[in-house]
Amino acid sequence: MTPFSSGVLFLSHHLPFYISKLFIMSNPVSESSSCSKKRVYLETLGCSKNRVDSEIMLASLQNHGYELTMTPDSAEVIIVNTCAFLTEASDKSINMILDLSDFKSSDNCEKIVATGCLTQRYQDSLAEQIPELDGLLGSNGFEQILELVRSMYEGSGHLQAFLKQKPHLQAI
């Protein structure tokens, strides 16, 4: 069995480290949900953990009927997996969200989601300062991307947030 036949993901290594586009080599599963066949674009910023988290999110979405796209202009859902390790990374993440939110004025883009460290750390201020955001997903809950995207389409139109707190040392 090759990695590709098992649906394993691979990265485009010729892109800059801090911005990688991810590809999945598997066929999507059809679903009757209102979200099936939506096109998804994901931009990853930051560390290797974010790359892995992005791969897991994309695999989950694709396995539930979402179509992945290489360009944001053809996506109905745009996801930005952010970084907040340094001030420069936070600024880059915010600028990327703002740049990609411009696609909401196009005919295709319906939803913008921010995930990762920036949303985990600055969830309240992000929700207030970037009203274009439809969803927030913290760095501790990336496996909930499918539930978040579905809730954005089935919800009230308000910002959807799925943010888990890190466990406190005393709770472990």
Model-inferred region functions:
Residues 5-24:
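Short, Lys/Arg-enriched N-terminal segments with co-localized hydrophobic residues
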